[in-house]
Amino acid sequence: DPIDPLAPCVGPYFLYGTLMDPSLLSEILALPEKPRLRPAKLTGYSLKLWGQYPALVDGATGEVVEGMAYDVESEQHAEKLAAYETRAYRSAPCRIRFMDGGEPGDISGTTFQYAGNPMDITEGKFDLGVWLRRMGRDGAGNQ
């Protein structure tokens, strides 16, 4: 079968923002158990804000964005993540560097980059804890 270039990618994803919350990720993907996330980072990117949500954009050469890596095992899961991220984001290839000392130390993967109007993003920091409290999700999956 020819590979569909528009098919969602499976494999390692670099997640940042709301998707770093294990309970939210479990909900979106309807996972039977808590997802295994590895602390990770991307180099050469920057996080801005799109409204209350973080927006990953190209950054300076040495700029680092920290997040979590998650292994997406099915196209259905990749599609659910893309739907959650909306059309304001597009999946893009990236080089994920792990921060937990485990192997492999880095790997090729996928992330969601902001694809909306650059005029709509602002400088600012996204705080997952504050967002979870605002959404009434505080501590929902942190036991």
Residue ranges and their predicted role:
Residues 1-143:
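Glycine-aromatic micro-motifs
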